[in-house]
Swiss-Prot record:
Name of the protein in its database record: Formamidopyrimidine-DNA glycosylase
Molecular function, one GO term: damaged DNA binding
One GO BP: base-excision repair
Binding partners and assembly: Monomer.
Residues the entry annotates as binding DNA: H105, R124, K167
Organism: Afipia carboxidovorans (strain ATCC 49405 / DSM 1227 / KCTC 32145 / OM5) (Oligotropha carboxidovorans)
Amino acid sequence: MPELPEVETVRRGLIPAMEGVRIARVTAHRNDLRFPLQTDFVARLGGRVVTGLGRRAKYLLADLDSGDVLLMHLGMSGSFRVAMDGGQEATPGIFHHPRSESRTHDHVVFEMDNGAVISFNDPRRFGYMKIVARADLEAEPFLKALGPEPLGNEFNAAMLAQACAGKATSLKAALLDQRVVAGLGNIYVCEALYRAHLSPKRRASTLASRTGAPSGHAERLVPAIRTVLNAAIEAGGSSLRDHRQTTGELGYFQHSFQVYDREGEPCRTRGCKGTVKRFTQNGRSTFWCPSCQK
C-alpha cells in the first residue's frame, strides 16, 4: 500500500493535468471497486472544475467548483495514468503492475478540457473513490479519526508524547496507528526509528516523561520522521512492489534505505558494528539494528 510520500508524489504529478481544469467527461467502466461508486458519481463530476488537488494522509482530495470534494485512495495497486493532449502516457507515482493491453483495469477515466486523459487503473480493485460535500468532509468516516499530518505544524514532540502517554503498545505500532499520526506506513516508520536510534520494540509511553512533557526520545523522533518523509518525497518515493511516479519513472528512495529490506547487511551508523535484523511485528516485517537502536 502506498505511504504518504508515494501519495504526495502522485498528487504533484497530477496537478498539471487536473488543477484548474474542467472535467469534460467521466467514464466509469466498472463501479465495483473496494466500495461501489455512488449512483450519481459521473453526473456530479462532469463539467466541474478541479479548483485544487490536496492530500490528507494517504488520501487524494480534489476540490471541485461545485463545493464537492472527490476523495480518492489508491488501495494496494491503484495508479493514475495520464496522457496529455494525445501524447504518450505517463504514470505519476511509483507503480509496478503492468497495464493490460486491453485496458481492462482502467476503471474510471477522466477526460479533461486541456486534452488530458487520466485513467484510474487498479488490477486488485482495493482502491476507491467517493464524492463528499466540502462541508461534510471533516465528518467523513475515512478522515475524521486521522491524526495530524507528520509534515504539518501541528505535529511536534509535545503532541506525539501526549498521544503516546500511557500506551503499552510498541513504539512502531503506535506510529502505524493513523489516529496517532496520519500517513505513516511500515517502510518509513522503520527508517525513522533507525534515524532516531530508537528500538521498534520500545514502549510508546516512553515518549512522554513522568510529567507528561516530551522525552528526549520524542524530541529525536519527530525531526527523524520529517527528514525521512521529505527525503522520500524529493526522491519520488519508493519503487517497491506497486508504486511508480506519474512520469512512469521509478522512485529512488529505496536506494537510500538504511535498514528497510537490508536484513543481514552491516549497519550504516558510523562506528556501529551491528547487523540489520528482521523480525515480524504485528504481522509486518520490521527491520532494525539492535546494536544502535535502543
